[in-house]
């Protein structure tokens, strides 16, 4: 290490042993405003923070961009794309971008308008660890070192609930035994007395239900709250190490222009001019009526104060939004009444309906107030699993959840097309909420695609998607281990008090301080996500919000149970998938030379066949008889039973000789129909040429008359075949 390179370490004690996160700066990416490398084991992530020289004064938002670059060489792999190089970011990379952005964004000075970009590049990946939390810490370190107006550092850790204990930075092997997996980011408050939570992303694991069946403790609200507390020591240690590094190598704090949205004189003038009318408009319960009245009041505000503040129209708009926010929050804090007249714990009107769309495999419509979600389920053969080219160990996805948010869902116009980061994030959250209750591949050998269409939006379409998806999956006949529902919680912070809101509206999300989404079954939490505009929230406040969310979740589950209480019969339009297990050494025989045998079975039966390396064969067809026909053919090859004299088969003529015809009874097993036995097919007359009565490819009902010591089979036409020939003549 040369003199310009500095390092600091965070050592986190866990029940499974110490975990060491190492930070370095001064060696790589020296031209960036701030750069840092974070290590966890052999995982190495470089983060570089840069800032534009000039601010974007015209913007009314903070232009922060976070990018995560997954380099396949980090895992010793070549990208699987046609050009063999990295292309657009993977879903994992996009989700990690969101994990970094969410705690970083509220930590910058308000009013900053210089473009800031944070780029985290995964240079090496330890096969035992996930890189996302390493990237969050690296991004915080590089930004802390950059001299920007940033109230960091921020520490982030993953904690897994393994064997009844919370373990920081768990390995993949430990996560396989965990019932809950949680990423927590936070900062040490100014007096150093506590850690404030800034971001949470968590879910039950796919193996949770099975682990619970073997006695593992469930991830209840109390357990999850304890996990937030368990994350605090690790966050504190990570922040300490970053502060130590900053003391050695941080650039001097730089002055950046801060653009105030409005001045107090504009706010005071607006309050005097339209304060009462705005307050009355905000008390209208219906969204459409409220929005119409608010548009009128907004126009009135511009007319009344525009002449006083000529050239400051942008300030008028910002002050109007600030006054609206102030009135909404004040009513909640002082009256415990919200925009639409509900109490702080009240849920909007609920509606659930299944089997809404014809011909699809499963569908449901879920409504909560003006939020309306259509869920649609499609089932397919396992070969339709999604192949993912990513650094994480999972290479395929059997359950795929896609979320769509068209502009008409909010009554607006806008771009439609490929999903944006928000849509990808919402789909991933709903996917994680449902993964723990999905049946295993063995129990339900189907690839499942779930699509959530946000047809109307006024608060938490992602949690509405969880509810609609549960209903749709049950309607499709998917045997879920338990139904899952979700609810979004909000928070208003005034002075030293916190008011928690159940089932927040879109406006309450915009004007509040927290968006806390919680999904789960009746017995445990399956997923949660926290975003906050504050510098942090006490863990005790989040624990209380979890308990408040549970009551709402149970009420929603009751409504869903009235719509559908158990899995329906599978749709007649869904494929039928069955399985058969064969010895591994028989796989080659089933496939045949150049796939001849398996292709023949598929052609004869009309089924689609997928062969797994362990000898499991999945057979999919449009109906049950076709699938059973393919299974019988496979069993005849790989799990054969010796035929017996007297058994009858619908065989196929495969070869004709001068002494008879060879008939295929099952794949790989033929019998001889001697020419002397063909009299019954020619009205009792002697047959001179076999070709006169039989042709290759002809189907014929035959009966086994003899099996000799060498296993050779002799056949004769069955009585049904003779009768059919007589009738034809």
From Swiss-Prot:
Cellular compartments annotated: Cytoplasm
Enumerate the GO terms in the molecular function aspect.
Answer: 3'-5'-RNA exonuclease activity; magnesium ion binding; polyribonucleotide nucleotidyltransferase activity; RNA binding
Entry's family note: Belongs to the polyribonucleotide nucleotidyltransferase family.
What keywords are assigned to this protein? Cytoplasm, Magnesium, Metal-binding, Nucleotidyltransferase, RNA-binding, Transferase
Known InterPro entries for this protein? ExoRNase_PH_dom1, ExoRNase_PH_dom2_sf, GPSI/PNP, KH_dom, KH_dom_type_1, KH_dom_type_1_sf, NA-bd_OB-fold, PNPase
Its recorded name reads Polyribonucleotide nucleotidyltransferase
Source species: Frankia casuarinae (strain DSM 45818 / CECT 9043 / HFP020203 / CcI3)
EC code(s) of this entry: 2.7.7.8
Primary location recorded for the protein, binned into one broad class: cytoplasm
Domain (KH): residue spans on this chain: 575-634
Gene3D superfamilies assigned to the protein according to its UniProt record, in alphabetical order: GHMP Kinase, N-terminal domain (3.30.230.70), K Homology domain, type 1 (3.30.1370.10), Nucleic acid-binding proteins (2.40.50.140)
Among CDD domains, the record links this protein to: KH-I_PNPase (cd02393), RNase_PH_PNPase_2 (cd11364), S1_PNPase (cd04472)
What this protein is reported to do is described as: Involved in mRNA degradation. Catalyzes the phosphorolysis of single-stranded polyribonucleotides processively in the 3'- to 5'-direction.
The residues the record assigns to binding Mg(2+) are 509, 515
Q: Can you supply a Gene Ontology BP term from the record?
A: mRNA catabolic process
Q: Say which domain of life the source belongs to.
A: Bacteria
**Cofactor dependency:** Mg(2+)
* HAMAP family cross-referenced by the UniProt entry: PNPase
GO cellular component terms, A-Z = cytosol
Q: Which reaction does it catalyse?
A: RNA(n+1) + phosphate = RNA(n) + a ribonucleoside 5'-diphosphate
Output the lineage of the source organism.
Answer: Bacteria, Bacillati, Actinomycetota, Actinomycetes, Frankiales
Q: What class of enzyme is it?
A: transferase
S1 motif domain residues are 646-718
């Amino acid at each position: 290490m040369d003199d310009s390179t500095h390092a600091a370490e965070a050592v986190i004690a866990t029940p499974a042993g110490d975990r060491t996160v190492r930070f370095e700066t001064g060696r790589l990416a020296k031209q960036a405003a701030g750069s840092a490398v974070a290590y966890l084991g052999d995982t190495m992530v470089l983060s570089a923070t840069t800032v534009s020289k000039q601010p974007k004064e015209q913007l009314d938002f903070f232009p922060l961009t976070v990018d995560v670059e997954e380099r396949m060489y980090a895992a010793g792999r070549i990208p699987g794309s046609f050009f063999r190089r990295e292309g657009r970011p993977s879903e994992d990379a996009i989700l990690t971008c969101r994990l970094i952005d969410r705690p970083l964004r509220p930590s910058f000075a308000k009013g900053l308008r210089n473009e800031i970009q944070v780029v985290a590049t995964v240079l090496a990946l330890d096969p035992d660890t996930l890189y996302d939390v390493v990237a969050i810490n690296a991004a915080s370190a590089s930004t802390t070192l950059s001299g920007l107006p940033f109230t960091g550092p921020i520490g982030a850790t993953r904690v897994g609930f393994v064997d009844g204990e919370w373990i920081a930075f768990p390995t993949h092997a430990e996560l396989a035994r965990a019932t809950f997996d949680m990423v927590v980011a936070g900062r040490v408050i100014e007096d150093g007395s506590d850690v404030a939570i800034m971001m949470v992303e968590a879910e039950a694991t796919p193996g949770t239900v099975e682990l619970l069946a073997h006695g593992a403790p469930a991830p209840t609200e109390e357990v999850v709250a304890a996990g937030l507390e368990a994350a605090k020591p690790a966050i504190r240690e990570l922040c300490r190490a970053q502060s130590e590094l900053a003391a050695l190598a941080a650039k001097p704090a730089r002055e950046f222009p801060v653009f105030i949205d409005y001045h107090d004189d504009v706010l005071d003038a607006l309050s005097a001019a339209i304060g009462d009318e705005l307050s009355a408009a905000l008390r209208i319960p219906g969204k459409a009526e409220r929005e119409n009245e608010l548009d009128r009041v907004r126009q009135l505000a511009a007319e009344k104060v525009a002449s006083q503040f000529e050239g400051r129209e942008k300030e008028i708009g910002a002050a109007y939004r600030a006054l609206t926010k102030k009135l909404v929050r004040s009513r909640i804090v002082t009256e415990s009444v919200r925009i639409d007249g509900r109490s702080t714990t009240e849920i909007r009107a609920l509606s659930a309906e299944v089997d809404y769309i014809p011909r699809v495999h499963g569908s449901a419509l879920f409504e909560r107030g003006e939020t309306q979600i259509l869920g649609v389920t499609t089932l397919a053969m396992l070969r339709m699993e999604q192949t993912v080219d990513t650094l994480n160990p999972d290479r395929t996805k059997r359950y795929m959840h896609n979320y769509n948010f068209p502009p008409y869902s909010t009554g607006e116009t806008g771009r439609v097309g490929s999903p944006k980061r928000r849509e990808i994030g919402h789909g991933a959250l709903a996917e994680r909420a449902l993964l723990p209750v999905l049946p295993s591949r063995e129990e339900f050998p189907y690839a499942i695609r779930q699509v959530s269409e946000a047809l109307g939006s006024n608060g938490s379409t992602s949690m509405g998607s969880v509810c609609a998806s549960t209903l749709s999956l049950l309607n499709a006949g998917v045997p879920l281990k338990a139904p899952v529902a979700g609810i979004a919680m909000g928070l208003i912070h005034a002075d030293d008090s916190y008011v928690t809101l159940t089932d927040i509206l879109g406006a309450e999300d915009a004007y509040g301080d927290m968006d806390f989404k919680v999904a789960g079954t009746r017995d445990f939490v399956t997923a949660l996500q926290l975003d906050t505009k504050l510098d942090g929230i006490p863990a005790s406040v989040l624990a209380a919000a979890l308990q408040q969310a549970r009551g709402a979740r149970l009420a929603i589950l009751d409504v869903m149970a009235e719509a559908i209480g158990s899995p329906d019969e599978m749709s007649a339009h869904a494929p039928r998938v069955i399985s058969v297990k064969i010895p591994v050494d028989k796989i080659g025989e089933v496939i045949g030379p150049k796939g001849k045998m398996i292709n023949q079975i598929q052609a004869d039966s009309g089924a689609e066949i997928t062969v797994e390396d362990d000898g499991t064969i999945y057979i999919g067809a449009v109906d049950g008889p076709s699938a059973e026909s393919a299974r019988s053919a496979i069993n005849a090859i790989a799990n054969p039973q010796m035929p017996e004299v007297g058994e009858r088969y619908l065989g196929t003529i495969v070869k004709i000789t001068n002494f008879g015809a060879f008939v295929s009874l099952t794949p790989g097993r033929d019998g001889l129909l001697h020419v002397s036995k063909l009299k019954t097919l020619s009205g009792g007359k002697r047959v001179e040429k076999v070709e006169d009565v039989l042709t290759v490819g002809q189907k014929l009902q035959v009966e086994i008359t003899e099996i000799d010591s060498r296993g050779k089979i002799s056949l004769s036409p069955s009585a049904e075949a003779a009768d059919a020939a007589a009738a034809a003549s």
